[in-house]
Amino acid sequence: MRGIILAGGSGTRLYPITMGISKQLLPVYDKPMIYYPLTTLMMAGIRDIQLITTPHDAPGFHRLLGDGAHLGVNISYATQDQPDGLAQAFVIGANHIGADSVALVLGDNIFYGPGLGTSLKRFQSISGGAIFAYWVANPSAYGVVEFGAEGMALSLEEKPVTPKSNYAVPGLYFYDNDVIEIARGLKKSARGEYEITEVNQVYLNQGRLAVEVLARGTAWLDTGTFDSLLDAADFVRTLERRQGLKVSIPEEVAWRMGWIDDEQLVQRARALVKSGYGNYLLELLERN
């Protein structure tokens, strides 16, 4: 399975901050926002990852992440010139996906929960599509899924004025290779975008879309506004201070997955030793 992180867009809801920097490079407490979706893919066992961003922001991501070798993964880059919709990621990333299945995660979405990585690994050999549902108070801001009495998905809508449920679809999607041709066959919506909801609708119509409600205790945070960005930082800060463990550290995930060894972890830690981040990496070895 290949992975794609979509980190494009102009971040207008965070202007003027994002007039000078990509939203996905902003800090969420003690690390760049992009680390959170990156570790989500890594915990799912995905090592071949393409990051899609704007031509203007691509150099910043490359400076931060490089080719991913220090994390035991392969990171490549592609650009989306205009924010023409989430589904365009599969057209842009077609060569990266090749004949494989693919997971798409949005660069401003944070997922946290017990056993999340183990749960996501189930989709490595997917046939069809798999998306998730999460109860929210303001579903009109998201794609929305409606469930029937037996828990089967009945309908999907993109940012409906009158939602049929409170279940939003978070920015994490798994598909088989058919998604490339499905995305290529889409037409722009009334909003002028190639909608991911339309991709999901095709799979739903074919009876090949699995919709799972995220397990109780799992947190999904969208960081697209000033308040939600601060809420996410507060959430991470509270978790880390109470537990003494950090959240969404790519080096830690790579080390625990066996993709980098102790010496590689030490080398990375030394480069960051002046911050608590580097010290935390060194403490991982002492604890184990």
From Swiss-Prot:
The protein's required cofactors: Mg(2+)
Spans traversing the lipid bilayer: none
Cofactor comment text: Binds 1 Mg(2+) ion per subunit.
Residues modified to Phosphothreonine: T12, T54, T197
Catalytic reaction(s) noted: dTTP + alpha-D-glucose 1-phosphate + H(+) = dTDP-alpha-D-glucose + diphosphate
NCBIfam families: rmlA (TIGR01207)
Any further remark recorded for this protein: Identified as a drug target.
Protein name: Glucose-1-phosphate thymidylyltransferase
Family of the protein in this entry: Belongs to the glucose-1-phosphate thymidylyltransferase family.
UniProt PTM comment: Phosphorylated on Thr-12, Thr-54 and Thr-197 by PknB. Thr-12 is the primary phosphorylation site.
Any single GO BP term: dTDP-rhamnose biosynthetic process
Pathway: Carbohydrate biosynthesis; dTDP-L-rhamnose biosynthesis
InterPro entries with a match to the protein in the record: G1P_thy_trans_s, NTP_transferase_dom, Nucleotide-diphossugar_trans
